[in-house]
Regions:
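Short, solvent-exposed loop/turn elements at domain surfaces
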Residues: 30-32, 47-52
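Hydrophobic beta-strand residues in large extracellular and virion-surface proteins
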Residues: 38-40, 60-64, 74-78, 116, ...
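N-terminal glycine/threonine-rich, aromatic-flanked beta-hairpin/loop signature
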Residues: 50-119, 123
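Acidic, glycine-rich flexible loop segments
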Residues: 126-151
Length: 220
């Protein structure tokens, strides 16, 4: 279920942000650009396909800073988090199995913790005055590293990820809570399908344990 990221490691190294436009309040006459600096976050969901492929979709966070007055050079700090097993075997704990009539019951315990799986600092990006909404990253051997800022939606798009600005309602804890719900739904659905196809049929009774202490540690 929660194996290490395979295809997203390269994405962690190249995800970068660019320009943020300030939103207008309902009573405001004019808008003002907030500039490129800021913290952004993205999570695109966890589905049965993630379970089947053993590839997780992490929560990505990036912090963008302008490095010159003209704001054409940026550096970005990037992090990626997902839930990893904390058991020595790095897999669910089988607590018990028993036959109940013709059906086998298996009790599983998923013991996991939100874990920092990728961190990269001071990634350099450049934008041109003729196209300020695109930042080209200085990263070797990785194609399609342009990041595009959409001023209409105030989002950053790169590959399959859409980044939104970090806020009180859109932050690591909020998305971690969403991740936990998605993970349980997807895993239970997958186990149901596996159990129905097994011989004898197996009913998985699953409990989940999520440790989010890394979030509290980061706030200290």
């Amino acid at each position: 279920m929660l194996k290490r990221i395979l295809q997203y490691l390269s994405l962690c190294i190249v995800l970068v942000s660019l320009f943020i436009l300030a939103s207008c309040s309902s009573n405001s006459v004019s808008s003002q650009s907030k500039g490129p600096e800021g913290e952004w976050i993205a999570y695109s969901g966890y589905t049965v396909q993630n379970v089947v492929s053993a590839v997780d979709t992490p929560i990505f966070i990036l912090n963008v800073k302008a490095r010159n007055d003209s704001k054409t050079i940026y550096t970005v700090d990037m992090k990626a988090y997902n839930y990893q097993y904390t058991t020595p075997e790095k897999r669910p704990v089988i607590e018990s199995t028993q036959m109940v009539g013709d059906i086998k019951e298996a009790r599983l315990n998923y013991i996991t913790a939100l874990t920092l799986v990728m961190s990269a600092n001071d990634i350099i990006g450049n934008s041109e005055s003729s196209n300020p909404n695109t930042i080209k990253m200085d990263i070797r051997d990785i194609p399609n590293t342009d990041l595009i800022y959409d001023s209409k939606t105030d989002t950053i798009k790169f590959s399959d990820q859409t980044f939104k600005r970090v806020s009180d309602t859109n932050n690591l804890q909020t998305l971690a809570d969403a991740y936990k719900k998605d993970l349980q739904v997807a895993s239970n659905k997958y186990l149901e399908e596996v159990g129905n196809a097994a011989n004898p049929k197996t009913k998985f009774i699953t409990t989940y344990s999520f440790d989010d202490s890394i979030i509290k540690d980061n706030k200290k």
